[in-house]
Amino acid sequence: MGDYYVSDAPSTVNLADQINQHLSPVQSVQPVQPIQTQYNPNVLTSQQLAQIQNNPMYHYNDSRFTFDFQEILKRAIKYLIEGLAVAFVAYYFIGKGKLNIKDIVMLGITAACVFAILDVFSPTVALGARFGAGFGIGTSLFGLNPAVIGGPSLVAPIL
């Protein structure tokens, strides 16, 4: 605070001199002229927007706060079928004695939830997961091990 000047003495500036400064008594005011604007078709005015809003051709179903129950039902059935497929494969290929029915049902529900989450947040990964799961099931059906399908000629030697 050393750069500020602080004093208890009254100011030497006369306030009356500050207020009564000489002002010119006559001020010239120019008349207001309307602004000329050119028509730009890329800019929507309220009149143009009213025409578009009232036209049913431009109404879309893009409200974020409405639910399409038909789409929800369709997706629920899709994921339940996928979960049942995973549960069927677990029951049929893992064996009836190794897992009980409760574990197999939980595996199917978990698979349905995983596919639903992947579809919402990453559709590309969901597609890859489905193909990967199908490929893995198919190779195990035929007794193929993908690591040794090509034999040692396809594997680079470790030095």
From Swiss-Prot:
Keywords: Membrane, Transmembrane, Transmembrane helix. Its main location: membrane. One of its GO terms (cellular component) is membrane. It comes from the Viruses. It is found in: Membrane. It is a multi-pass membrane protein. The chain crosses the membrane at residues 76-96, 104-124, 131-151. This is Uncharacterized protein L434. It comes from Acanthamoeba polyphaga mimivirus.
